[in-house]
């Protein structure tokens, strides 16, 4: 699991530093998703999902939030799991079902879902696949402990 989490770290050298007024705790930056390599793939622990973590903190470049894009092929899934921080999803392309604490919710372009902290949730993509943005109020993706139901 640690090796998988290490793959979430994003090299921010491709990020563009934006003007920073002196009163901001962290410098703003912009990054193009196309410049961030995909992580993930197929794994019996987490399913068949790939992701690009676009905004992510490190010791050298701290952040207050994590933002990324998850990508699923047709019928692929992210297995049920939990983590302490709440999370949001915002559908970008395709469709699917996100089951949160046993209740299925449709996700598609323009649909936002709020997932409370420690709520069990998993995703199954529809026949055309699925892309959604995800985010956490966390200093880094690596600080988030994923607890998959099958290995809980």
Swiss-Prot record:
<feature type="binding site">
    <location>
        <position position="83"/>
    </location>
    <ligand>
        <name>Fe cation</name>
    </ligand>
</feature>
<dbReference type="GO" id="GO:0046872">
    <property type="term" value="F:metal ion binding"/>
</dbReference>
<comment type="subunit">
    <text>Homodimer.</text>
</comment>
<protein>
    <recommendedName>
        <fullName>Dimethylsulfoniopropionate lyase DddW</fullName>
        <ecNumber>4.4.1.3</ecNumber>
    </recommendedName>
</protein>
<keyword id="KW-0456">Lyase</keyword>
<dbReference type="GO" id="GO:0047869">
    <property type="term" value="F:dimethylpropiothetin dethiomethylase activity"/>
</dbReference>
<comment type="function">
    <text>Able to cleave dimethylsulfoniopropionate (DMSP), releasing dimethyl sulfide (DMS) and acrylate. DMS is the principal form by which sulfur is transported from oceans to the atmosphere.</text>
</comment>
<feature type="binding site">
    <location>
        <position position="89"/>
    </location>
    <ligand>
        <name>Fe cation</name>
    </ligand>
</feature>
<dbReference type="InterPro" id="IPR013096">
    <property type="entry name" value="Cupin_2"/>
</dbReference>
<feature type="binding site">
    <location>
        <position position="121"/>
    </location>
    <ligand>
        <name>Fe cation</name>
    </ligand>
</feature>
<keyword id="KW-0479">Metal-binding</keyword>
<dbReference type="InterPro" id="IPR011051">
    <property type="entry name" value="RmlC_Cupin_sf"/>
</dbReference>
<dbReference type="Pfam" id="PF07883">
    <property type="entry name" value="Cupin_2"/>
</dbReference>
<feature type="domain" description="Cupin type-2">
    <location>
        <begin position="69"/>
        <end position="124"/>
    </location>
</feature>
<feature type="binding site">
    <location>
        <position position="87"/>
    </location>
    <ligand>
        <name>Fe cation</name>
    </ligand>
</feature>
<dbReference type="InterPro" id="IPR014710">
    <property type="entry name" value="RmlC-like_jellyroll"/>
</dbReference>
<keyword id="KW-0408">Iron</keyword>
<comment type="similarity">
    <text>Belongs to the non-heme iron-dependent dioxygenase family.</text>
</comment>
């Amino acid at each position: 699991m640690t090796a998988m989490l290490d793959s979430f770290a994003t090299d921010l050298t491709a990020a563009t530093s934006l003007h920073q007024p002196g009163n901001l705790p962290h410098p703003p930056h912009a990054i193009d998703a196309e410049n961030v390599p995909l992580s993930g793939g197929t794994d019996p622990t987490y399913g068949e999902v790939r992701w690009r973590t676009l905004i992510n903190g490190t010791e050298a470049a701290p952040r207050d939030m994590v933002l990324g894009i998850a990508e699923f092929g047709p019928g692929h899934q992210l297995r049920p799991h939990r983590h302490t921080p709440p999370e949001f999803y915002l559908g970008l392309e395709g469709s699917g079902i996100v089951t949160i604490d046993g209740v299925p919710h449709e996700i598609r372009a323009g649909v936002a879902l709020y997932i409370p902290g420690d709520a069990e949730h998993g995703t199954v993509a529809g026949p055309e696949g699925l892309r959604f943005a995800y985010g956490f109020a966390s200093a880094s993706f690596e600080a988030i402990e994923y607890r998959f139901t099958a290995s809980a």
